[in-house]
Amino acid sequence: MLILRFVYPRATPERRRALMHWWSRKLLAILNITPQVEGAAPAAGETQAMIVANHVSWIDIFLISSVRPTRFVAKSEIRAWPLAGWIAERAGTLFIRRDQMRDMARIDARVREVLQEGDCVGLFPEGITTEGDELLKFHTSLFEPAVANGAHVHPAAIRYEHPDGTLCRQMSFIGDRTFMESIELILGQKSVRARIMFAPPVDTAGAARRDVAKRVEASVASLLGLEPRGRAPSTPGDR
């Protein structure tokens, strides 16, 4: 915590990425979560990279950053979460009010800047979390910076499992479950395998954002062995 509070804000971009990578791996170990990477994640030196994944838990951002340090676009409500919100803010998360078109434009510009600075950007385009047994329709609006910058979009699927391979629903952060209840459920597990599966990157050159979103969504669904079963609430940027 002291590192995030005092060292991280003053560190160089390269040092920040190293610290986020270290902290994410440390947190997973503390929670008895073992990451299992399948497929090829964005290489450490790859620029203009974006990771797009399904969303199950607040742990997702640390799972992804344990593989490749990443700055995430996340709903503004996360900033108010105990501990996780503070950590996310310190780690450079880009918070967005999805119900306000002006904020969508601000985040669009900021994501472009972050990509151009060489940081990897992470998106959870379902907009809400699930238990991991379904995939909601992807919002398309936040794919625009990737298309504008010709970024490589890496589809990723997240699945939390018990040691026997069954879905660990206790990892999900859904409904009325509070952050403290989520912590208690996670700590109640002897061990959890966190699978993060990567599909080949989607080239955005000359593509429309809706086409990119559709291709990425299909890749994530395939990795999970699922089909999209619903639609996340619409936002102004999707219209």
Q: Where does each model-flagged region fall?
A:
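Catalytic core of membrane glycerolipid acyltransferases/transacylases, capturing the structured
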Residues: 1-17, 21-22, 28-31, 44-101
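Soluble, non-transmembrane catalytic domains of enzymes that act on hydrophobic metabolites at membranes
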Residues: 25, 30, 34-40, 59-61, ...
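Generic preference for hydrophobic
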Residues: 37, 51, 72, 196-198
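Residue-level preference for the first positions of well-ordered beta-strands
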Residues: 48-50, 93, 120-124, 152, ...
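A cross-family acyltransferase "interaction/gating" segment
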Residues: 83-86, 132-215, 226-235
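A membrane-cytosol interface segment of integral membrane proteins
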Residues: 94-115, 120, 218
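Catalytic-site beta-strand/loop segments enriched in glycine and acidic/polar residues
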Residues: 114-143
